[in-house]
UniProtKB/Swiss-Prot annotation:
GO cellular component labels: mitochondrial inner membrane; respiratory chain complex I
GO molecular function term, any single one: NADH dehydrogenase (ubiquinone) activity
Function statement: Core subunit of the mitochondrial membrane respiratory chain NADH dehydrogenase (Complex I) which catalyzes electron transfer from NADH through the respiratory chain, using ubiquinone as an electron acceptor. Part of the enzyme membrane arm which is embedded in the lipid bilayer and involved in proton translocation.
Predominant location category: mitochondrion
Similarity section: Belongs to the complex I subunit 4L family.
Native species: Mephitis mephitis
Record keywords, A-Z: Electron transport, Membrane, Mitochondrion, Mitochondrion inner membrane, NAD, Respiratory chain, Translocase, Transmembrane, Transmembrane helix, Transport, Ubiquinone
Subunit structure: Core subunit of respiratory chain NADH dehydrogenase (Complex I) which is composed of 45 different subunits.
Transmembrane regions: 1-21, 29-49, 61-81
Enzyme class: translocase
Enzyme Commission (EC) number: 7.1.1.2
Name of the protein described by the UniProt record: NADH-ubiquinone oxidoreductase chain 4L
Domain of life: Eukaryota
Amino acid sequence: MSMVYINLFLAFIMSLMGLLVYRSHLMSSLLCLEGMMLSLFIMISITILSNHFTLASMAPIILLVFAACEAALGLSLLVMVSNTYGTDYVQNLNLLQC
């Protein structure tokens, strides 16, 4: 396993730990999720390029589309919660139920 894969794996683990530690604020959770998606995207892209998997070349693009959708939904939820309650605490998400 090369140093690049080790660094990307550590970046994923650090983002996961950040998600577990800073789960009270929505903005911190979204940033940690984006870090996880970015490290997964780079890891999948490097694996496909180094092993010459031509059939799986669409996997990073699909992952990027899901990451963009997740970011858009997360930011819209963040704006809605911060405009409604003035803070970005995750506990305010329980109050959004109809």
